[in-house]
Amino acid sequence: MSRIGKKPVVIPSGVTINVAAGNKVEVKGAKATLSKTFSTDVTFSVADNVATITPNNNSKNAVAQSGTARAILSNMVEGVSKGFERKLKIIGVGYRAKAQGNELNLTLGFSHPVVYKLPQGITAETPAPTEIILKGADKELLGKVASEVREYRKPEPYKGKGVRYEDEYVAKKEAKKK
């Protein structure tokens, strides 16, 4: 059986979990409200500030789904209580970013500025023109947004120019010699 799925999710104070019909789970907290529909192979039970996920049968798929559901529920609880953030760095001459409301204006060496509309629930800050901080309660959506912003200009392997995650290491290639 999955060891992750066996672990209960501790619910901090100020966070409530409601399980509706069809395995639709809603997590409410100080920062946001998140809801997700999970597989019918698992059953949720909430008691005494602890949520447990149990597989409906011992099939390989049900056990795998219990571990996945537990990890997602844990991320939802952490997201509505503390929130998540992802930092991006921009490296390159003239490469800049500026957050304006729910838009992110990127100057990445194209003939035109790139305007990225942030989805609801995600906020962006630019403490420096070469630094982007994305914040949100939904870890999955935050990762998707960070990936889409990075996709506009991935770090190239010769000089390392482009948009990268703060903790990302870019392996550099040696230039061709005559």
Curated annotation (Swiss-Prot):
Q: Coiled-coil regions in this chain?
A: none
List the GO molecular function terms: rRNA binding; structural constituent of ribosome
Quote the PROSITE patterns the UniProt record gives: RIBOSOMAL_L6_1 (PS00525)
Q: May I ask which residue range the UniProt record assigns to the signal sequence?
A: none
Report the GO terms under cellular component.
cytosolic large ribosomal subunit
Keywords (alphabetical) are: Ribonucleoprotein, Ribosomal protein, RNA-binding, rRNA-binding
One GO BP annotation of this record = cytoplasmic translation
Which InterPro entries does this one have? Ribosomal_uL6-like, Ribosomal_uL6-like_a/b-dom_sf, Ribosomal_uL6_a/b-dom, Ribosomal_uL6_bac-type, Ribosomal_uL6_CS
User: Which SUPFAM superfamilies does this chain map to?
Assistant: Ribosomal protein L6
Q: Which family does it belong to?
A: Belongs to the universal ribosomal protein uL6 family.
Summarize the protein's role: This protein binds to the 23S rRNA, and is important in its secondary structure. It is located near the subunit interface in the base of the L7/L12 stalk, and near the tRNA binding site of the peptidyltransferase center.
Task: Summarize subunit and interaction data from the UniProt record for this chain.
Answer: Part of the 50S ribosomal subunit.
Q: What is this protein called?
A: Large ribosomal subunit protein uL6
Origin organism is Francisella tularensis subsp. holarctica (strain LVS)
